[in-house]
Amino acid sequence: MPVDAWIREEIEIPEGVEVTVEGNTVKVKGPKGELQRELKYPGVQIFTEDGKVVIYKEFPRKKDVAIVRTFKAHINNMIKGVTEGFKYRLKVVYSHFPMTVKVQGDEVVIENFLGEKNPRRAKILPGVTVKVKGSEIEVEGIDKEAVGQTAANIEQATRITKWDRRVFQDGIYIVEKAGKPIKF
């Protein structure tokens, strides 16, 4: 059963940002760069009118309402990315073995983690910059998903599975996600 006759979500386009919709592809261009994403779902229409992006669906069911609001969140994140960008902060923590972290090409290389001879590597996704400053790592970019996945790759590379986490707390941990501190 349809929830309503229609659902219409509108997003204001801020100054200095240009949004174009071609078919199912939404392109957002701003001062920090350009992002594009394919947003496709049967019956959902995306278009621009009067300085707004409109997402519209007739006779939506619950799932359709969720999809429309998901598309709205994706477009909002694209607009925020090209205007402000996204930044994750990670902290390098060690007590037993001093590890070194450095960026080589499109990888983060972690050496001497728990005294291991072979370095551990984490992939950096395209469009993301990683800076290592002592015991802090900054991951920045305009695509929220790429920045978040790169930070997760770095955190995952130093995951300990076989040892007691209460004793061996060495690793790299996300401490701030897109400007919001993480509570432990």
From Swiss-Prot:
Subunit structure: Part of the 50S ribosomal subunit.
Alphabetized NCBIfam families for the sequence: PRK05518.1, uL6_arch
Protein's UniProt keywords contain Ribonucleoprotein: yes
GO process annotations (BP): cytoplasmic translation
Organism the protein comes from: Thermococcus kodakarensis (strain ATCC BAA-918 / JCM 12380 / KOD1)
InterPro entries: Ribosomal_uL6-like, Ribosomal_uL6-like_a/b-dom_sf, Ribosomal_uL6_a/b-dom, Ribosomal_uL6_arc, Ribosomal_uL6_CS2
Protein name, per record: Large ribosomal subunit protein uL6
Membership in a protein family: Belongs to the universal ribosomal protein uL6 family.
